[in-house]
Regions:
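Extracellular, surface-exposed repeat architectures
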Residues: 255, 260, 314, 324, ...
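Predominantly extracellular beta-rich ligand-binding scaffolds that present long acidic/polar faces
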Residues: 360-482
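Right-handed parallel beta-helix
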Residues: 128, 141-152, 169-178, 181-192, 204-219, 232-251, 260, 324-325, ...
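Short glycine/acidic-rich loop motifs that flank beta-strands on beta-rich extracellular proteins
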Residues: 154-160, 194-200, 218-224, 251-258, ...
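Extracellular polysaccharide-degrading/modifying enzymes targeting complex plant/algal/animal polysaccharides
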Residues: 1-189, 230-232, 462-473, 481-532, ...
Length: 542
């Protein structure tokens, strides 16, 4: 028998390069300095140009990409080219000629270059490394760091550098630790990192990071745990506390990154942190896809203020994100808002997001609002519980369940769901298609009209066995327009047993100046994106 002709036998060719439009890539001066940054659905990859054929409009990359280019929904995969001398045309831009070591910079309006302090880091990726030998039961122990600022590392950009699968896990930290136990970082700063901030890796346990400022990062801020379960089993990372830290301003170079990453690690506490301005995820818990056994369990994510995440960059991210089996993990009393996906893709930008295999997780007493795609989203998972939360203004698909499975996917009970687009639950990723239990919930749409439930009326939705003891009624927030989600004394939610959420307790605590520090951050509004271009013309058959 004969087989149909295939463009490629595997994904490998789609990782090596791509077809571009006429004129988008050309042989610039100092061509070898140019970098191509490719936006995949949930990460970016950075490449040098290995080969260029302008006539055929083909560019080949070094290194190759971890993900096939055009994977998922990105048929019009976004990319940009940077570090090109000819593109230096606006204030605030710079270009580095690697051959001569010359840095060219276009000053900002009113900037006096005679008074500018310019710092070029000479440390390559890691500034401080704690090197215990946990495999030999030899540890670095009982140290306290107070009031120290760890600053300035370079990032590694090379044709043979690894590219990431997810979460900037191939990038090095400014402060790295293995076999670190019973240590405290207090009132410290980690800043101006070319890649990641702090990583407590193999064998790190019972450490505390408290009241630290972590900012201006090329990638992610804090990692707890190893990537692989082999290391996690023999050299566990556990019982670490990340409390009352101001973590803000990452993803500057490696954009698919997050504020806090808890990998193959258990019994950790991530509490009372202010986490903002990362391009993929605020807090990520778990690093195992599907239902395979994993060593991530019993983690607590509580009283965090997570906001301004994704920022129009990606189509698959969230404020608080989970991955894999994680029994005993609790997500409680967090406030999550302003999670903005790229408008070019149909999904992404979730408040609380259970991704592949998320299992055994309790989500309670959280307030989620102003997210682009879903306030509560489950790709697929088992026996999760969302109760006593406020989900407001949840975008296109406020409450979702993407993959039907034979087991109970989740229970949704005692929540308040406030919509403003006439839809309470998604019809695209419909919870009605999954095994889900809905009960004792209060729904309201700001239009005053009855919202739809996965495309059907409330009565039809109830006939499926869901929400038979639930109501549609105004929850009587103090001022939902101003995002004041405190409940008035006469709220029907209180009569239904809803427990008031102490919203004001989320985020930083302590001295007034420390608590007020996040309010001093100034953000530019997100620029409008141009409409996507049409698909490129097909190449002629030869």
């Amino acid at each position: 028998p004969f087989n149909r002709a295939k463009w490629y036998e595997s994904d490998i060719l789609a990782k090596q390069g791509f077809l571009f439009r006429n004129g988008d890539i050309r042989r610039w001066e100092n061509f070898d300095d140019a970098l191509i940054v490719i936006y995949h659905s949930w990460t970016t990859s950075i490449h040098f140009i290995k080969e260029l054929d302008p006539k055929e409009r083909i560019v080949k990359l070094a290194p190759i990409s971890t993900w096939p280019i055009g994977y998922w929904w990105e048929y019009n995969t976004r990319y940009h080219v940077e570090n090109v001398a000819e593109a230096l045309d606006q204030p605030g831009e710079w270009y580095l000629d690697r051959g001569t070591g010359t840095l060219s910079y276009w000053p900002l309006p009113g900037e006096d270059m005679t008074k500018v302090e310019a710092i070029a880091p000479i440390v390559r990726q890691t500034l401080v490394a704690f090197k215990g030998r946990p495999e030999a039961k030899r540890f670095v122990e009982h140290l306290r760091f107070r009031g120290i600022s760890f600053q300035h590392t370079e990032c590694l950009l090379a044709p043979d550098m690894p590219t990431d699968q997810q979460g900037a896990t191939e990038r090095a930290p400014l402060v790295a630790a293995e076999g670190l136990r019973h240590c405290v970082f207090e009132d410290c700063e980690i800043a101006h990192a070319g890649e990641n901030g702090l990583w407590l890796d193999r064998g790190c346990s019972d450490n505390v990071v408290r009241r630290c400022r972590i900012r201006d990062l090329g990638a992610s801020a804090v990692f707890l745990g190893p990537k692989a379960d082999g290391d996690a089993a023999s050299m566990p990372v556990e019982r670490n506390v990340l409390d009352n830290n101001f973590i803000q301003g990452g993803s500057h170079i490696f954009r698919g990154s997050q504020g806090v990453w808890v990998g193959r690690s258990s019994h950790n506490q991530v509490t009372h942190n202010e986490i903002a301005d990362f391009c993929h995820i605020g807090i990520s818990v778990g690093h195992s896809w599907g239902y395979a056994p994993t060593s991530a369990h019993d983690n607590l994510v509580a009283f965090n203020h997570v906001h301004h995440i994704s920022n129009g960059m990606f189509s698959d991210g969230g404020g608080i994100y989970t991955l894999g089996i994680s029994p005993g993990t609790v997500i409680r009393n967090n406030v999550v808002h302003d999670v903005t996906p790229t408008p070019l893709m149909p999904v992404g930008g979730c408040g609380i997001y259970h991704d592949e295999g998320s299992t055994g997780i309790l989500v309670e007493n959280n307030v989620v609002y102003d997210v682009g795609a879903a306030a509560y989203h489950q790709h697929y998972g088992r026996e999760n519980v969302a109760r006593n939360n406020i989900f407001a203004f949840g975008g296109r698909d406020p409450i979702t369940c993407a993959r039907p499975e034979e087991h109970l996917s989740y229970t949704f009970e005692g929540n308040i769901a406030l919509s403003n687009a006439g839809q309470a639950t998604s019809d695209h990723f419909s919870p009605m298609k999954c095994k889900t239990e809905f009960r004792r919930n209060l729904y309201w749409d700001t239009s005053g009209k009855e919202p739809l439930f996965s495309g059907v009326s409330f009565a039809e939705w109830q006939r499926t066995g869901r929400d038979r003891d639930s109501r549609i009624a105004d929850p009587q927030f103090y001022d939902a327009k101003r995002r004041d989600f405190r409940l008035k004394p006469g709220s029907p939610a209180l009569a239904m047993g809803f427990r008031p959420i102490p919203i004001e307790q989320a985020g930083l605590y302590g001295e007034a100046a420390w608590v007020a520090a996040p309010s001093k951050v100034r953000r530019e509004p997100l620029p409008p994106l141009p409409p996507p271009p049409p698909p490129p013309p097909p190449r002629p058959m030869v």
